[in-house]
Amino acid sequence: MKYLFTILLIFICKYGYTFVSNPLLYPFPNDTKIIIHSEGNGKIKKGILKITNPGESPWIVQSWTEGSEGKKTAVYPALARIEAKSSLVLKIYPQPNDKDKSEWMVVLFIPPDSLRKPSELTIPIAYRLKII
C-alpha cells in the first residue's frame, strides 16, 4: 500500500499539470451589479460595467436590459468585439423619469469559431446582473 501511494504521488506530481495546463479563459464582468450614478449637475445618470477578456482569442459581447414594463435602458455598445487580453467598458443610461429600478442587464459572450472543433458544440455564456 505504501508503494502504491508513492507511485500515485509521483504520477500526480509529474503528469498532474497536463490536466489543467490549458484552461479555457473566457470573458467576465468585473462586477455583480450595476450602480446608476448621477454625473455633473445631476441631470445625467449613468452606470458603468467593465468586461475583461483574459483569454487568447476575441469574443463577441452582446448586452441588453430586461424588466420595468417596456421602459428601455440604453446600453452602449450593445454589440461589440472584445479582443484577446483586453477590456471593454459598457455604459448604461436609464430613462430620465425612470423611478422603478427593478431592471436586469444581460451580458452574452459569444465564443469565436476558432475555439470550436468539428465534433464539439460551443455554448455562449450569459450573465444576468442587477441594475440598482
Swiss-Prot record:
Q: Name one GO cellular component term.
A: outer membrane-bounded periplasmic space
Any single biological process term in GO? cell wall organization
Q: Which domain of life is it from?
A: Bacteria
Which Gene3D superfamilies does the record match to this protein? Immunoglobulins
Q: Name one Pfam family in it.
A: PapD_N
Tell me the protein's name: Protein FasE
